Curated annotation (Swiss-Prot):
Gene of this entry: addA
Enzyme Commission number, as recorded: 3.1.-.-, 5.6.2.4
Matches recorded under CDD domains: DEXQc_UvrD (cd17932)
Organism: Lactobacillus delbrueckii subsp. bulgaricus (strain ATCC BAA-365 / Lb-18)
Reaction it catalyzes: Couples ATP hydrolysis with the unwinding of duplex DNA by translocating in the 3'-5' direction; ATP + H2O = ADP + phosphate + H(+)
Protein name: ATP-dependent helicase/nuclease subunit A
C-alpha cells in the first residue's frame, strides 16, 4: 500500500535545486522521508547511488538506512517491467554496500585514504580506537612538552610556561593546569581552524580602552545581559507598586522602602544605559539596597507575600551582579584582564606544542585517532594546493547531492567540512534534524549551527534555500503530545533554546490510534510528598523505586490495554512494553536489585559507571594510601572495607586518640597500645608498609595483582551480589595498568591521576554487563541511550535530582567553544581571594545557559519516547515553610503570559524546576483533580492526571513465599547453599537473638544522625554521601577535605540556608565591637570562598543582625574570649538514653557532635543553639512550644557533654529562633 505523505513531507521529498533544511520534530517520520527522497532521486532522476553522500550520526543509523534503501530497491525491481530500468536497479543494488552512507568519521577516512598524498602522511596507518591508549599517548605527549619547557634555554619561553602553571598553583585541584590543556584539546579538535581559535583565546582580555565599560566584551555581551536582567526586575517592581494603594494606611508603611529601592535601581539602570564609568556604575549598584522589614499584615497578606518575593529577587540579583561583574574596581579589572591575556596566550602556546607533540607520537606509531580523521580530511579539502584542488574537484563532481541526518548534532569542524564538499553556486545540500533533540554538547555538538540556518532559510528572500517544518507526530497518543506541548510551550523560546516552540515547535497529533479502543488516555504525574527528600544528588532512593514498581504492578494487574501495531489489535500491556528513563546510569545496579526484590523483571541497558563501583573505590583508595598514607578518606575507605573489616566503633576509638592530627597519625599512635584492636592496626600498618616498599621496585600491574592475592579481594567481591561482574571490573583495572606501563609510564601517583582524569571524562572501562536478552522485561536506560527509540509506556525518573553543571562553571577556569574564562588568586602578591576576570564572569553565565538549554532538550527527548502512555515520576521535596498546595501555587505564578521568564529558567536546578510551573499552572487553570494510585482505571477521560502515591496504601507487592521458594529452583549447588543460609538468617532475625536492636544501629553516632529522635526537620536534607555503596557502613567516608556542596549551588534548600546562617554567626567578630558588621562578615566569607554568592544573597541578614545586637549577645562584645562557637564534643551513652524502644544491651554508643555556642559566665555556662525553623506568626506561642519539645533532647545531650568535660556547670539552655526573632529558654 502506498504511503501517504503530508504536504510538508512531500515537499521535502520532491524539492530540487535548493539547499533544504528540514526541522523534523520527534516522531515525524524523518527517516522514512530521507529514504523516500533517495529512492525518488534514483528512480526519477536516475542518480547513481554512488553519486549520493549520506551522512548519519551513528553506524547503526547508517546500517539501518542502507538496509531500508536496499529493501525499497528490491521491491521496485520486482515490480519493474522495463529491462533497461531493471538493469539500472540491479547496478544500484550491487553498489549499495560501497555507497557512502556512513558516519562523518567513515567518510573522512575515505578522504584520507584516497588523498593522503595531499598532506604527506604515510598511507599505511591504522586507527587507534582504544580510549586508554589514546589517553596514555596524550599523557606522554604532555609530559614531553612539560619537560621540554622546563629544560628550555630560552628563559622567556620557560617563564611563560611557569606562569601558566603558577596561575593554578593555589587551586584546590593540583592538576588544574594540566586539566586545562587536556580540556582545550577537546574543544580545539572540534574547530575548523584550531590554531587560529587557540590564538584568539587572549582576545577578550586585551582591552583597547581605559575603562572596561568601553570594551567590546562589555558592550556586546555583558551590558545587554545586565539591561535585560534589570529590566525584568524593574517590571516586577513597577507591577507591584501599581498594585499597592499607597494612599491607604495599610500600604503606606511599605512605600518608603520600595520607592527608595526603585529610585536607586533607576539610577543604576540609567548609568548602565549611558555608559557611565565603571566605578560610577559600581557605586550606584552597591547603593541598591532594600532597607526595612516587610512584616506580615493579615489584611493584605497576599500583597506582603508578593512584596517579599520581589524584594528577595531584587536583593539576590543586585548581589549576584555585583559579585560577578563589579566586585573589582576598574583598576583591579585591568590588572586581572592583563594577567588573563598573559595566561591565555601562554595556554594557547603550550596547547599548540602539546598538539604538535601528540601528532608526532601518533605519526611515529603510524596511527590516527578519530579527531585526526576529521582534522586531516578538512585539511585535505581546504588547503591552497593543487592536490587539495584535485580532492575538492573529485568530491564536488562526484556527489550530486549531500544529505546530512541529525544535523543538529554536528560541530563547527564537521559543518565546515560539509560546506567544502559543495561546489560554489550549486544548491545540493539536504539537512534534516531537530534542534529540540540536540543533546550532545559534551561531544562539542553546536545546535547554534542549526538555529542559524533555521533562521536564515526561513526568510522569504533566501534564494536557493528553503526551510520545511515537520510538525506531525506519528508516534505518540494525543495525551502524550498534549503534555509535551503544555510543558515546552512555556519553556523553549527564541532566547532559551533558539526556537519559539509555541509558534514553530508544537507537536501535531497524527498517530491515528483507533478512537474506539479503550487505550490509556492520560499522561500521569506520579508523585509522593516527602519532607525529607533530598534533591542534591543523582541517586534514586527506595521511595522513588517503590512508587514506580507499585505503578508498574498495577498496570500489569489491570491488564492495561495497548495497541499492538503488529496485529492491529489491542492487548494487555506486558513488562516488555515498558521503559524507564533516567538522567544517568549511576543507580542502575541499585535499581536492578530493587526490581529483583519485588519480582519485576528488568533489563539494564547500561552498566553502572565503572569508577564508581564499590570494588574500584576500594582498590583505588588502597593505591592512594600506598602512594601517600596521609589521606584520611581513602585510608578509612580501605580500613572499613571487607578486606580489613574495621567497624565504625573501631574507627571512632582510633580517632579519639588524637583528633587534631591526620587519621594515619592517629592510627600509628593507637597501634602502640596493648589491645586486640591495636594488634589489628599493627597488622594493617605492616601490610601497608610492605606494599609501599614493593611499589618502589615493581610495576603498577604487579602491585595490583599482589594486592588482589594478599587480600583475597578477588574472592571477596566474587562472593558479593553481581560478583562475576565485579571480578571482571578488577581484572580490567589490572589490564589498564599494564597498558599504562607499556606506554612508558611507571609512576604510581601519575597513574592515580590518569585514572582520575578518565573518570572525570567519563571514559568507562567496565566490562559488558552479564545479562540475557531483554525478553519480556522492563527496560532501564539513560535518556541519551533512548534517543531514536520508542516504547508503548515510558516512565521518566529522577526529576527531583539536581543537575551537576556546577563543575563546568566553577574553579579556576571556564571553557567553552566561545572562549576561555580565567579567575586568579588576587591580589597577585598576597592571594587573599579568588577574583573573576570579566571574561570569566560572562562565560560562566553563557555556559550555564547552554548547559540548561541542553537539559531542557534532554527532557524533550525523554518525554517524546512514549507512544501510548507517559508517566512522570517525582519525589517532591516540601520546603519547611509550605505544603504541596502552597508549592504548586508558587510554581504556577512563575508562568507569565504562558511562559517562564529567562530569569526563572536560569535559576533551574533540577528537571522538576522545568516541568513543575507548567504542570501546576495547567492544574490550576483546568481545575484538574488528583487521584490515588488505587483509584486509577483504564480508559479514563482527559489528557493529564496527577496521581498521588501513598507509601502506606500503595505499597509495592513483594513476591509471596511460594514465589520466593520457586525462585531457588534453578540455582547452582553453591547458590542454593547461600539461599538456605539466607533463610536461616531470616528466621534467626525473627527469633531470640538478644541484641537484635543493636544490630540495627552502630556503636558510633553523630548528633546529626540521631536528631530524628528529637524531630530535627532538616536531618535528611543535610545527609550526603559521595561513596554511595559505602554510605550505610561508614560515617568517616564523607569527603571532609572538600568544599561543602552549598558553595557551588545556585538554588538552595532550607537546610543549606540554616548551615550558612550558622557559618556567619560562627565567624562574626565580636572582638571588633561593631554591631553593624554582619554585611562585612558575609562579604568576607564570600571572598574567601567559604560561602557562595547565591546563599549570601538569600540569607536573612535582618535576623542575623537582630541576634548580634540583642541583649542576649551583649556580654559577647565585652568578653569575647569567653564565647565558644562550633565546639566539638564526644560522649559515651547507653543506647536506651537515645532510643526508648531499645532492648537491654550491655554495650555503649559513642555520640559526637558540634555545639553551636556557649558562654562561660562567672558562675556557670549559658548554652545556646541556633534554629532557622519557620514559625507561623499566627500561632507563634504554640509553634515555639513545639520547637522547645522538639529540641529539648538535643540540648540535654549538649548539656551532658559540657558537664562531663570538667567545665563549669550548665546554668541555662536557650534556643535562638532566628525566623521569629525570639530567644527561649529550654528546661
Amino acid at each position: 500500500m502506498a504511503v501517504k505523505y503530508t504536504p510538508d513531507q512531500a515537499r521535502a521529498i520532491e524539492s530540487r535545486g535548493q539547499d533544504l533544511l528540514v526541522s523534523a520534530s520527534a516522531g515525524s517520520g524523518k527517516t522514512s522521508v530521507l529514504v523516500e527522497r533517495v529512492i525518488r532521486e534514483i528512480m526519477d532522476d536516475h542518480l547513481e547511488v554512488n553519486q549520493l553522500l549520506v551522512i548519519t550520526f551513528t553506524r547503526a543509523a547508517a546500517s539501518e538506512m542502507k538496509q531500508r534503501i536496499k529493501q525499497r530497491l528490491q521491491d521496485r525491481l520486482q515490480e519493474e517491467t522495463d529491462a533497461s530500468q531493471a538493469d539500472f536497479l540491479r547496478r544500484q543494488l550491487a553498489e549499495i554496500d560501497t555507497a557512502i552512507i556512513s558516519t562523518i568519521d567513515s567518510f573522512c577516512l575515505d578522504v584520507i585514504r584516497r588523498f593522503y598524498f595531499a598532506i604527506d602522511i604515510d598511507p599505511d596507518f591504522s586507527i587507534l580506537t582504544d580510549a586508554t591508549q589514546i589517553e596514555l599517548l596524550k599523557e606522554r605527549a604532555l609530559r614531553d612538552v612539560e619537560n621540554g619547557y622546563l629544560q628550555n634555554e630560552d628563559q622567556a619561553k620557560k617563564d611563560r610556561f611557569l606562569a601558566l602553571y603558577d596561575a593554578f598553583a593555589g587551586d584546590s585541584n593540583a592538576n588544574s593546569a594540566r586539566d586545562l590543556l587536556f580540556d582545550l584539546y577537546q574543544f580545539a579538535m572540534a574547530r575548523p581552524n584550531y590554531r587560529a581559535w587557540l590564538q584568539k583565546l587572549a582576545a577578550p582580555y586585551q582591552l583597547e580602552t581605559s575603562d572596561v565599560v568601553d570594551s567590546t566584551l562589555w558592550q556586546e555581551k555583558i551590558k545587554p545581559y545586565l539591561e535585560e536582567e534589570f529590566s525584568n526586575l524593574a517590571d516586577k517592581l513597577t507591577a507591584l507598586m501599581a498594585e499597592a494603594d499607597f494612599d491607604h494606611e495599610k500600604f503606606a508603611k511599605y512605600q518608603p522602602a520600595f520607592t527608595a529601592f526603585a529610585t536607586s535601581l533607576a539610577s543604576y539602570r540609567e548609568s548602565l544605559a549611558t555608559d557611565d564609568p565603571f566605578d560610577r556604575q559600581r557605586e550606584l549598584l552597591a547603593a541598591c539596597q532594600f532597607d526595612g522589614t516587610l512584616r506580615t499584615n493579615k489584611e493584605i497578606a497576599d500583597f506582603v507575600e508578593e512584596a517579599k518575593e520581589v524584594k528577595e529577587a531584587g536583593k539576590q540579583l543586585v548581589f549576584n551582579v555585583y559579585t560577578s561583574f563589579y566586585a573589582s574596581s576598574n583598576a583591579d579589572q585591568h590588572a586581572l584582564l592583563a594577567k588573563g591575556a598573559e595566561i591565555a596566550s601562554a595556554a594557547a602556546e603550550v596547547e599548540l606544542a602539546f598538539i604538535d607533540r601528540f601528532n608526532e607520537l601518533k605519526r611515529a606509531d603510524r596511527v590516527l585517532d578519530f579527531s585526526d580523521m576529521e582534522q586531516l580530511a578538512y585539511e585535505i579539502l581546504t588547503q591552497d594546493s593543487s592536490n587539495s584542488d584535485l580532492a575538492r574537484a573529485y568530491y564536488q563532481s562526484r556527489f550530486k547531492e549531500i544529505m546530512v541526518d541529525e544535523y543538529q548534532d554536528t560541530n563547527a569542524l564537521q559543518d565546515g567540512l560539509i560546506q567544502r564538499l559543495k561546489k560554489a553556486g550549486k544548491n545540493n545540500l539536504f539537512m534534516v534534524g531537530d534542534v529540540k533533540q540536540s543533546i550532545y554538547g559534551f561531544r562539542q555538538a553546536e545546535p547554534s549551527l542549526f538555529i542559524a540556518k533555521y533562521d536564515e532559510y526561513g526568510q522569504e528572500n533566501s534564494a536557493g534555500k528553503q526551510r520545511i517544518i515537520f510538525a506531525e507526530n506519528f508516534r505518540s497518543s494525543q495525551p502524550v503530545t498534549q503534555a509535551v506541548n503544555l510543558i515546552f510551550d512555556s519553556l523553549l523560546t527564541k532566547d532559551f533554546g533558539g526556537i519559539d516552540y509555541q509558534k514553530e515547535g508544537q507537536l501535531k497529533f497524527a498517530a491515528g490510534y483507533d478512537p474506539e479502543a479503550a487505550l490509556p488516555t492520560e499522561t500521569e504525574v506520579l508523585y509522593q510528598e516527602d519532607s525529607s527528600a533530598t534533591d542534591d544528588d543523582g541517586e534514586l532512593n527506595q521511595g522513588d523505586l517503590a512508587m514506580v514498581i507499585s505503578r508498574i504492578q498495577k498496570l500489569i494487574a489491570d491488564q492495561t490495554p495497548i495497541f499492538d501495531p503488529k496485529t492491529g489489535q489491542t492487548r494487555p500491556v506486558s513488562y516488555g512494553d515498558i521503559a524507564i528513563l533516567t538522567r544517568s546510569k549511576t543507580s542502575n545496579l541499585d535499581i536492578k536489585q530493587e526490581f529483583d526484590r519485588y519480582g519485576v523483571p528488568l533489563f539494564v541497558m547500561d552498566v553502572q559507571n565503572y569508577f564508581q563501583t564499590f570494588e574500584l573505590t576500594v582498590i583505588m583508595s588502597y593505591l592512594k594510601i600506598i602512594d601517600n598514607p596521609d589521606q584520611d578518606i581513602p585510608l578509612v575507605a580501605v580500613l572499613r572495607s571487607p578486606i580489613f573489616n574495621f567497624s565504625s566503633s573501631d574507627l571512632a576509638e582510633i580517632r579519639l586518640v588524637n583528633k587534631s592530627v591526620s587519621f594515619y597519625a592517629a592510627l600509628r599512635t593507637y597501634a602502640k597500645k596493648d589491645t586486640d584492636l591495636a594488634a589489628r592496626c599493627r597488622d594493617f600498618l605492616a601490610q601497608l608498609q610492605d606494599l609501599r616498599d614493593f611499589s618502589l621496585s615493581h610495576r603498577i600491574s604487579e602491585l595490583l595483582w599482589t594486592i588482589y592475592e594478599r587480600t583475597s579481594f578477588l574472592e571477596i567481591v566474587t562472593a558479593m551480589t553481581n560478583g562475576q561482574q565485579r571480578r571482571l571490573n578488577l581484572t580490567a583495572l589490572y589490564e589498564r595498568a599494564s597498558a599504562y606501563e607499556s606506554s612508558g609510564f611507571k609512576d604510581l601517583y601519575q597513574f592515580i591521576n590518569f585514572i582520575a582524569r578518565m573518570r572525570k571524562n567519563q571514559k568507562d572501562l567496565a566490562q559488558p554487563i552479564l545479562s540475557e536478552n531483554a525478553g519480556n522485561s522492563v527496560k532501564l536506560m539513560t535518556i541519551h541511550a533512548s534517543k531514536g527509540l520508542e516504547f508503548p509506556v515510558v516512565f521518566v525518573l529522577g526529576l527531583e535530582h539536581r543537575y551537576n553543571y556546577q563543575q563546568d562553571i566553577t574553579g579556576s577556569y571556564v571553557l567553552d567553544a566561545s572562549g576561555l574564562g580565567l579567575s586568579f588568586a588576587y591580589p597577585f602578591d598576597e592571594a587573599e581571594y579568588r577574583a573573576d576576570t570579566l571574561a570569566n564572569a560572562w562565560l560562566k553565565i553563557a555556559k550555564k545557559k547552554k548547559l540548561l538549554e541542553e537539559e531542557a532538550r534532554l527532557l524533550y527527548v525523554a518525554l517524546t519516547r512514549a507512544k501510548q502512555k507517559l508517566i512522570l515520576a517525582a519525589n517532591i521535596k516540601l520546603p519547611a515553610r509550605t505544603d504541596l498546595a502552597g508549592l504548586e501555587e508558587k510554581w504556577a505564578k512563575e508562568i507569565s503570559a504562558g511562559r517562564l521568564t529567562l530569569l526563572d529558567k536560569m535559576k533551574v536546578a533540577k528537571p522538576l524546576d522545568f516541568l513543575a510551573p507548567a504542570l501546576a499552572r495547567a492544574k490550576q487553570v483546568k481545575r484538574l483533580g488528583e487521584k490515588a494510585v488505587s483509584d486509577l482505571a483504564t480508559g479514563q477521560e482527559g489528557s493529564l492526571v496527577f496521581v498521588h502515591f501513598d507509601p502506606k496504601k500503595d505499597q509495592a507487592q513483594l513476591p509471596d513465599s511460594e514465589a520466593v521458594a520457586a525462585s531457588g529452583a534453578d540455582l547452582t549447588e553453591d547458590e542454593a547453599a547461600v539461599f538456605k543460609q539466607a533463610e536461616k538468617l531470616y528466621t534467626f532475625s525473627q527469633g531470640g537473638y538478644p541484641y537484635l536492636d543493636a544490630s540495627r544501629t552502630t556503636a558510633y553516632q553523630a548528633v546529626s544522625e540521631i536528631k530524628k529522635v528529637f524531630g530535627d526537620p532538616i536531618e535528611d536534607e543535610l545527609a550526603d554521601s559521595h561513596i554511595s555503596e559505602l554510605q550505610s557502613a561508614n560515617r568517616y567516608l564523607q569527603p571532609i577535605d572538600t568544599e561543602p556542596d552549598f558553595l557551588f549551588q545556585n538554588t538552595v534548600s532550607s537546610a543549606e540556608l540554616g548551615t550558612a546562617s550558622h557559618l556567619v554567626l560562627q565567624y562574626y567578630d565580636y572582638a571588633k565591637g561593631d554591631k553593624d558588621a554582619i554585611d562585612s562578615c558575609i562579604a568576607g566569607l564570600v571572598e574567601k570562598g567559604r560561602l557562595s554568592q547565591t546563599l549570601a544573597s538569600m540569607l536573612d541578614r535582618e535576623a542575623l543582625s537582630w541576634f548580634v545586637k540583642s541583649d542576649f549577645a551583649k556580654d559577647f562584645y565585652q568578653q569575647p574570649d569567653r564565647l565558644h562557637r562550633e565546639e566539638n564534643f564526644a560522649t559515651i551513652l547507653s543506647p536506651k538514653t537515645l532510643f526508648k524502644d531499645f532492648s537491654d544491651f550491655p554495650g555503649k554508643i559513642l555520640v559526637h557532635g558540634t555545639i553551636d555556642g556557649y558562654y562561660e559566665a562567672e558562675n556557670g555556662i549559658i548554652l545556646f543553639d541556633y534554629k532557622t525553623d519557620h514559625v507561623n506568626p499566627r500561632k507563634q506561642d504554640e509553634a515555639i512550644q513545639k520547637l522547645k519539645e522538639k529540641y529539648q533532647g538535643q540540648l540535654r545531650l549538649y548539656e551532658r557533654a559540657l558537664n562531663e568535660s570538667g567545665r563549669l556547670p550548665v546554668l541555662k539552655k536557650y534556643l535562638v529562633l532566628l525566623s521569629c526573632r525570639e530567644i527561649v529558654e529550654v528546661d
